[in-house]
Amino acid sequence: MTVTVKMLVDKLKLKVVYGNEELLAKAITTADISRPGLEMTGYFDYYSPERLQLVGMKEWSYLKTMTANNRYSVFANIFREETPAVVVARGLEIPEEMLQAAKENGVAVLQGRNSTSSLSGDMSWYLNSQLAERTSVHGVLVDIYGMGVLIQGDSGIGKSETALELVKRGHRLVADDRVDVYAKDEGTLWGEPAEILLHLLEIRGVGIIDVMSLYGASAVRDSSQVQLCICLEHFENDEVFDRLGNSNEEIELQGVKIPRIRIPVKTGRNVSVVIEAAAMNYRAKQMGYDATKTFKDRLTDLISKNGED
């Protein structure tokens, strides 16, 4: 996905101090952010001009100790053709020499009101999510009690209908039919809908419904972490399904492994309630309570008592 300076400005509500339409259309190609403190001393080895340049209180205070000519020289070296923009935090005053060098080198100058660390975190979070490599998977992503559950299965098995029932039970739809997943950082998988399918759900026999319009803003999310995969499968008499919770199946997406639970589907079974219970049970395991282990311990105690008798 291409991220432009204008998109960053709109997302983080930054003020454009200098920058025309052409400069704001510049692409940001990396999520890494540079604080050019060392470069201000004249050391440019390993300098990465393609990064966003962030000026905070430390850099600003150091600039105040320099002469006007030295400040201009510093920014003339920092600003390159490939530099997307410079962001000044805390609403600090923009030095005239910075503006002059920015105009001469074609670099947008932006200003944020937040602290330097807060602004850096916000920019990194946004850029990492937008620039991450994406994979599209077939399924439905639903936020169940704050946990992202990816529901997969054969076409026509009832994924969308199940998602609708979960929404009616107070949970939130993230994506239907196509889920774009990406690793925001190591070990963390996120999913979001394709823009054209945002907040929409397809129900066979009914058509396309707008979940946000029908059920309100509390029934949808624009993105969610993916923590659990539920695979719906047609019930077959000769098929063996886990009945004790011993299964440790996983699927791997974008290099991140998440647990997978296979749930048989047959007429009369309330799949949405089963998925809800599976999600709560998984969360309980994450918190240290394992119902399967409790059952095994009770069974072991019972066998021991019977043996003594």
Curated annotation (Swiss-Prot):
User: Which coenzyme or cofactor does it need?
Assistant: Mg(2+)
Q: Does the keyword Flavoprotein apply?
A: no
**Positions of the region Important for the catalytic mechanism of both phosphorylation and dephosphorylation?**
201-210
Family matches, as Pfam families: Hpr_kinase_C, Hpr_kinase_N
* Region entry Important for the catalytic mechanism of dephosphorylation, spans: 264-269
Q: What EC number(s) does the entry state?
A: 2.7.11.-, 2.7.4.-
Report the SUPFAM superfamilies cross-referenced here: HprK N-terminal domain-like, PEP carboxykinase-like
Q: Where is the active site?
A: 138, 159, 177 (proton acceptor), 243
The cross-references to InterPro entries, in alphabetical order and at most eight, read: HPr(Ser)_kin/Pase, Hpr_kin/Pase_C, Hpr_kin/Pase_Hpr_N, P-loop_NTPase, Ser_kin/Pase_Hpr-like_N_sf
Q: Could you tell me which PANTHER family the record lists for this protein?
A: HPR KINASE_PHOSPHORYLASE, PROTEIN YJDM-RELATED
Q: What does this protein do?
A: Catalyzes the ATP- as well as the pyrophosphate-dependent phosphorylation of a specific serine residue in HPr, a phosphocarrier protein of the phosphoenolpyruvate-dependent sugar phosphotransferase system (PTS). HprK/P also catalyzes the pyrophosphate-producing, inorganic phosphate-dependent dephosphorylation (phosphorolysis) of seryl-phosphorylated HPr (P-Ser-HPr).
Subunit and partners: Homohexamer.
Which protein family is it in?
A: Belongs to the HPrK/P family.
Query: Could you tell me what this protein is called?
Result: HPr kinase/phosphorylase
